[in-house]
């Protein structure tokens, strides 16, 4: 018997169709091809004037005068999480606009002219793009310079974060959805938080954190050290996805308290689906005897 991992399932599979969350949890690995962390390309935003972008930044983490919360998401998974938590019917009085990596904007929820709350989301990564390195576009750099919230995965997944925030003058709140920013958190969280006090932006790790696992693979050819100390692909576990969704929901509630009930109900519904997904995954794997399991995967993340 052969166990095909979730990321390799057919998109039209009845099992996957049962769960709206499957596109994020099960199919996401196709967005991250294998890449050495040392192969970073220069960020496109470095060509911009950092002082000019910094002048656009602000430190507010709640809705501005127009009642708009501006958010940026680093990965496709986080972009999908936020979309599912913020997408509601017109009765919610929440207007939500999501701009993808292709620059196209989609509208969800209440009519913008009638809504009492507004949320805009800029998604940095495109499908099939590496989550480790990213060249910011001019529009993305501008969005980050004005953002109230910058949602990231953490556990050292996104190597481009420092360059992105430094070059844009980001002064909002970086929400670490996994609850673990990186290996430094594991080594000495108190010391890491002390260092962050000097940063021009705040860091919010939420109330929950994922269970980090040591990176099981040896160094790549020609390298003396492994690419990671801990496995950053945390969202491939539904249990870890629950942590991320919970932390995202809490951050959105804090930024737009008048929509707290909407976000909370969407988080509860999403978590319920993730729990069912976890049960299905465990049952599927356990149906094959352990000594006969063969794993086919497109990435070293499962």
Which functions belong to the PLM regions below?
Residues 1-35:
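N-terminal secretory signal peptides that target proteins for export/translocation
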Residues 5, 15-18, 25, 42-47, ...:
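Acidic/proline-rich low-complexity IDRs
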Residues 5-8, 37, 50, 227:
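Residue-level detector of transmembrane insertion/anchoring sites
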Residues 25-26, 42, 55-302:
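Extracytoplasmic metal-acquisition and chelation regions
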Residues 30-59:
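Secretory targeting and sorting signals
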